[in-house]
C-alpha cells in the first residue's frame, strides 16, 4: 500500500495504523509540536526534523531518520521548484534605474525642434531661474533648448496632467499660471470635486512633472491652467532622463569628491556627504566678478566647480591665493558669522556650488559637532584663520 502521508488511506500523523482514527492525545501532541516548532525553510542547509518529533522524515511518512531524500543532499536547482513553491512568497517591485548610465540607449540622440530667435529668447528667459537647469554646461543647455517644444494653452481650466496617469513629459511654465490639485485617493476622480484639494500654484519660470519621469511613477497631482493664454514648454521623458538626470548624478559624484577634500567635513559619512551634495546650489560668475567681499558677513561656503579665482586682501593688487577647480573657501561661515577675511574675485568664467550655514544645520545639525569629530585644531585653509575649537 502507498505509504505517503498524503496518499489514499494514509495516516498523516504517522502513529496510528492505516485507516485508523487519530485519538485526542495524538492530536494534542501535534498541536504542542506546532506551537513550539521553529519554521525553517526546506531549502536551508540546516533543515531537519526535531529529534522529538513523531514524524520520521522531513516531510513525514516513512522516510528514513538518517538518510535525507536525494533532493536535499545537494543545493536545490531553482528551475526544479514546484509550481506552487513561490505562491505565497513576497514579490519585489522594480522600476527603471535612477542611474542614467544603466539605461541602454547607445544610439540615442536628443530630438531637435526648430525655433525662431524670438522663441529661443523667450525660452532662455523661462528656464533661466529654474534650478533643474542651473547646473547644465553649455552643450547640455543647447540640447535642452533644442529638445523643448512649445505647448500653447489657450483657455482656463485645461488639464495638462492628471493624477494617476503615466508620466510622459516634463513642463516649464513660460507664461501664465497653473493650479495644482491632489486627491487623497491617489487618482483623479469623477465629478466636480474629483481633482481633490488645491495645494499650490505654479507661476512663470516654474516647472512640474519631473517626479513621474524620475521615478517611473504615476502622476502625483492634477495640474490645470489657472488663466487663459498660458504657454508651456515640454520636454519628453527620455531626453529628461538622459540629460537632466545624467548631469545631476555626475554633479553629485563630483561634489562628493570635492567634499572629501574639505578638512572641516572629512568625517562626514557617505550618506551625510550625499545630503550635502544634493543641497549645494550652483552660481555662475563672469571674469572680474566678486564672489565674496572682504568685511562682509559670512553666510555661505563655496566649492569651485569650474574656472579660476584669486583672493585679495584690502586694496592689494596682488593675489594672496589662487583657486582652481576642486578648491573651496568660506567654510568657516558654517561655524560663525565672522566677517570675510579676504575678497575672492573670478579671473575666468566661474561656476561655484554654495551651501549656507542654515542649510547645513538643517541637514546635519550644528557644525560644531562635525568639527569635534574632525578634530579641526590648528587647521587653516584658504585665507581664513580660526581659533582652534576646544574639544
UniProtKB/Swiss-Prot annotation:
The keyword Nucleotide-binding applies. Residues 1-84 are annotated as: Disordered. The keyword Membrane does not apply. 3',5'-cyclic AMP 2 binds at residues 264-381. The modification Phosphoserine is found at residue 92. Residues 1-131 are annotated as: Dimerization and phosphorylation. 3',5'-cyclic AMP 1 binds at residues 132-261. Keywords: cAMP, cAMP-binding, Nucleotide-binding, Phosphoprotein, Repeat. GO terms for molecular function: cAMP binding; cAMP-dependent protein kinase inhibitor activity; protein kinase A catalytic subunit binding. Residues 38-55 have a biased composition (Polar residues). Signal peptide: none annotated. InterPro entries: cAMP-dep_PK_reg_su-like, cAMP_dep_PK_reg_su, cNMP-bd_CS, cNMP-bd_dom, cNMP-bd_dom_sf, RmlC-like_jellyroll. GO terms for cellular component: cAMP-dependent protein kinase complex; cytosol; nucleus. Tetramer, composed of 2 regulatory (R) and 2 catalytic (C) subunits. In the presence of cAMP it dissociates into 2 active monomeric C subunits and an R dimer. Belongs to the cAMP-dependent kinase regulatory chain family. This is cAMP-dependent protein kinase regulatory subunit. It comes from Colletotrichum orbiculare (strain 104-T / ATCC 96160 / CBS 514.97 / LARS 414 / MAFF 240422) (Cucumber anthracnose fungus).
Amino acid at each position: 500500500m502507498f505509504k505517503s502521508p498524503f496518499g489514499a488511506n494514509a495516516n498523516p500523523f504517522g502513529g496510528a495504523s492505516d485507516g485508523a482514527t487519530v485519538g485526542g492525545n495524538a492530536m494534542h501532541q501535534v498541536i504542542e509540536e506546532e506551537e513550539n516548532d521553529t519554521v525553517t525553510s526546506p531549502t536551508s542547509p540546516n533543515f531537519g526534523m526535531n529529534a522529538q518529533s513523531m514524524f520520521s522524515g522531513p516531510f513525514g511518512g516513512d522516510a528514513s531518520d538518517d538518510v535525507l531524500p536525494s533532493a536535499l543532499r545537494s543545493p536545490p536547482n531553482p528551475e526544479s521548484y514546484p509550481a506552487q513553491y513561490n505562491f505565497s512568497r513576497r514579490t519585489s517591485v522594480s522600476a527603471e534605474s535612477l542611474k542614467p548610465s544603466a539605461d541602454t540607449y547607445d544610439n540615442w540622440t536628443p530630438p531637435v525642434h526648430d525655433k525662431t530667435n524670438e522663441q529661443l529668447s523667450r525660452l532662455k528667459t523661462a528656464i533661466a531661474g529654474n534650478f533643474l537647469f542651473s547646473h547644465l554646461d553649455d552643450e547640455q543647455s543647447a540640447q535642452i533648448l533644442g529638445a523643448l517644444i512649445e505647448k500653447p494653452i489657450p483657455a482656463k481650466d485645461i488639464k495638462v496632467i492628471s493624477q494617476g496617469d503615466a508620466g510622459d513629459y516634463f513642463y516649464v511654465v513660460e507664461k501664465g499660471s497653473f493650479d495644482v490639485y491632489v486627491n487623497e485617493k491617489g487618482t483623479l476622480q469623477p465629478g466636480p470635486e474629483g481633482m481633490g484639494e488645491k495645494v499650490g500654484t505654479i507661476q512663470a519660470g516654474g516647472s512640474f512633472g519631473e517626479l513621474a519621469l524620475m521615478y517611473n511613477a504615476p502622476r502625483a497631482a492634477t495640474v490645470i491652467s489657472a488663466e487663459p493664454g498660458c504657454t508651456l514648454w515640454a520636454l519628453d521623458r527620455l531626453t529628461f532622463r538622459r540629460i537632466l538626470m545624467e548631469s545631476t548624478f555626475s554633479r553629485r559624484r563630483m561634489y562628493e569628491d570635492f567634499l572629501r577634500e574639505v578638512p572641516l567635513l572629512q568625517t562626514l559619512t557617505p550618506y551625510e556627504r550625499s545630503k550635502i551634495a544634493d543641497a549645494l546650489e550652483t552660481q555662475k560668475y563672469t571674469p572680474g566678478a566678486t564672489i565674496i567681499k572682504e568685511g562682509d558677513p559670512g553666510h555661505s561656503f563655496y566649492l569651485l566647480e569650474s574656472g579660476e579665482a584669486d583672493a585679495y586682501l584690502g586694496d592689494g593688487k596682488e593675489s594672496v591665493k589662487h583657486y582652481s577647480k576642486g578648491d573651496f573657501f568660506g567654510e568657516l561661515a558654517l561655524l560663525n558669522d565672522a566677517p570675510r577675511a579676504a575678497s575672492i574675485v573670478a579671473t575666468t568664467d566661474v561656476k561655484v556650488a554654495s551651501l549656507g550655514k542654515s542649510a547645513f544645520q538643517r541637514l546635519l545639525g550644528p557644525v560644531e559637532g562635525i568639527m569635534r569629530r574632525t578634530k579641526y585644531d590648528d587647521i587653516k585653509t584658504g585665507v581664513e584663520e580660526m581659533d582652534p575649537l576646544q574639544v
